Amino acid sequence: MYNPFSLEGKTILITGASSGIGRTTAIECSKLGANIIITGRREDALVETISFLTGEGHEYVVGDLSSEGGCASLVEKLPVLDGLVSNAGVGKMLPVQFYSEDVLDEVFKVNAFAPMLLLKLLIRKKKLKNPSSVVFTSSISGYSNVAPANGIYGASKSALTAYMKYAALELAGKGIRCNAVHPGRVNTALIANNRLLSEADITKDMEQYPLKRYGEPEEIAYAIIYLLSDAASWVTGSNIVIDGGRSLK
C-alpha cells in the first residue's frame, strides 16, 4: 500500500529514547519500517524501549551526550544515518533570583550544546546521507510561550531553535534538512512525576489550552515522522508547533 510517510529501510538515530516522546517516536518509526538506533543514559530503560519496537535488528547505545567526548563516542559506533531525532532534554524550574552557573551549565549542555556538537560530529564523520533529515525536539517554551520559573529551560530551547535555522541553511547543500517540533505540555512521566504541580495546578493549566487537554506522545511522534519522511523532502528550516492551540493565547 502506498504510504508517503513510510520510513522503510531508513536508519534513524533517536536520542533521549529512554522514555516519553523519544521512546514513543522510536516505537512509531519502527512501525513504519525504520531501522532504529536509540541512545540514552539508562541501559535498563533503553532495553525496555527496544522490547516495544516492531521488527528486528534495532540497536541501543548507552551514552551521555552532555560532553563533546560523549557525543564523539556515540558517533564512532554509528552507521551512516538517514535521520536523526535530537530529542534528549532536561528541565529545571527556578525563579530568576535562584539561577546558578551549575544549573545553567547542566541545562544548556543537554538541551542546546549537545545537539550542536552531535550534529557537527555526524557531519565531520560523514555519518548523514544525502539526502537525510534532522529533527530537533524543542518546546513552545523556546518559541512562543513563557511561564514563571521556566526561564532556563525556555532559553535553552530558544537557543536550539535559533541554531536549527542556521544549520538548515548551511547544510541544505549537503541534502540535509533540519527542522524543529515545538510541543506544549505532553502526558509523559515528566508531568506525572512533577511534584511542583498539584492536580489543581494541572487542571488550571489545561484550561489554558483551547483543546482543553495536554498532548499525547504519539501526537508529537507523528509530526516527527512527517519531517523524517520523504513527504517532507521540500521542508527545511521550519518550526512545527504542536500544542493544542496553547500558543494562540
PLM feature segments, named:
Residues 172, 177, 235-237:
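Short, small/polar-rich loop/turn modules that mediate ligand/substrate recognition or access, typified
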Residues 95-96, 103-108, 205:
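Substrate-binding pocket helix/loop in short-chain dehydrogenase/reductase
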Residues 119, 156, 164:
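Active-site helix of classical SDR
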Residues 18-19:
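Conserved glycine-rich cofactor-binding loop
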Residues 2-3, 225, 236-249:
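Short C-terminal tail/terminal secondary-structure segment
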Residues 139:
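Residue(s) in the substrate-gating loop at a strand-loop-helix junction
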Residues 124, 169-170, 233:
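Alpha-helical segment proximal to the catalytic Tyr-Lys
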